[in-house]
Amino acid sequence: MDANLIEQKSDYNKIKKISLLLFILLILSIIAIIVLIIVLVTSEKSKTNEQNKQNFKGFNYWVEKYNMMDHIEGGKFQYGLYASNFKVNLTGFEDLERLGTSTCYYMLNSKEPGKFHKLKGDECWLFHDGTPLTMYLMNETSGDIQTKLLGLCDECDPLICVKGGTIFGEIGGEQYTFVSLETVPGYDDRDFTLYEKEELLNKYPQNKEIIETIYPS
């Protein structure tokens, strides 16, 4: 075989090996950069979560500050924060006349969910402190459930409004979730319906898993 041809072939093999080595190094560099980005993002999220936890006032702080009481549907509350002086007459409401709006403080945690209930009027939930709260909004006719997160996380909304006639329940954050509620028209016991576990299971068996989460015992 010609010496020049042998030398060219040898040079080609060397270039091929070097190219392969450079390609491998490039792939490893890309992987290292991706891993570094993941580590930095995870670290930043952990740092943010830790800062948020440190900023929490605490479950007992709010209970004591506002002298909150046990609520029939679960959690703690303090009613009478604000009630409008204006009164309205509405079709479909017993005795028709209601306050224009009213507000209260409410607090839940994962061990003390808010049982499924229904209001004739609308109710808006405003997040104040703690970890995100999960809300289950169920259509009374079809049983279809929409899940929403109340809080300040990327997937959350700090304000969630529930339309009157919706059956809904909630599970507070791992530590607690402190919120305020605004009811329109103003809250009245005659407009409130609380559901029992068996009643819901019989009517909406397709929602058994969520119902049993709200009613653990």
Task: State where each predicted segment sits.
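Intrinsically disordered cytoplasmic terminal tails of membrane proteins
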Residues: 1-16
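Alpha-helical transmembrane segments in eukaryotic/viral proteins
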Residues: 16-25, 31-47
